[in-house]
Amino acid sequence: MAKPKTNNTKKRIKKNIPKGIAHIHSTFNNTIVTISDEKGNVLSWSSAGAIGFKGSKKSTPYAAQMISEAAAKGAMDQGVKSVQVEVKGPGPGRDAAVRALTIVGMEVTSIKDCTPIPHNGVRPKKRPRK
């Protein structure tokens, strides 16, 4: 006789975390938005590929807006109402991602630019020939 099927999936525990940190990593090819609590534990994340954008469409401001909305909705399900925003990188989706957080209904308390800037670090690669 066959054993009855047991459900091995974890149930998501609904947390009530009022404040969070939105990490926006924007490169020239992609944008990744991660929303964590104040300790750094990830609550929700999203990227252009996870939503369904492919190729050069991943680097557009529209894609960044959709990514930010998806990550914010996941965090709001866990009770996040206000976020501090940390933006890293020079990509085209920086501003659109921050704007989308306010459109969804999250309160943005501060915006911090964490883009790493070298103090004349390593030697750059040779220039591509034309």
UniProtKB/Swiss-Prot annotation:
GO molecular function: rRNA binding; structural constituent of ribosome
Matches recorded under InterPro entries: Ribosomal_uS11, Ribosomal_uS11_bac-type, Ribosomal_uS11_CS, Ribosomal_uS11_sf
Keywords: Ribonucleoprotein, Ribosomal protein, RNA-binding, rRNA-binding
GO annotation terms (biological process): translation
GO annotations of cellular component type: ribonucleoprotein complex; ribosome
Task performed by this protein: Located on the platform of the 30S subunit, it bridges several disparate RNA helices of the 16S rRNA. Forms part of the Shine-Dalgarno cleft in the 70S ribosome.
The family this protein is said to belong to: Belongs to the universal ribosomal protein uS11 family.
Assembly and oligomerization: Part of the 30S ribosomal subunit. Interacts with proteins S7 and S18. Binds to IF-3.
Name of the protein in its database record: Small ribosomal subunit protein uS11
Taxonomic classification: Bacteria, Bacillati, Mycoplasmatota, Mollicutes, Entomoplasmatales
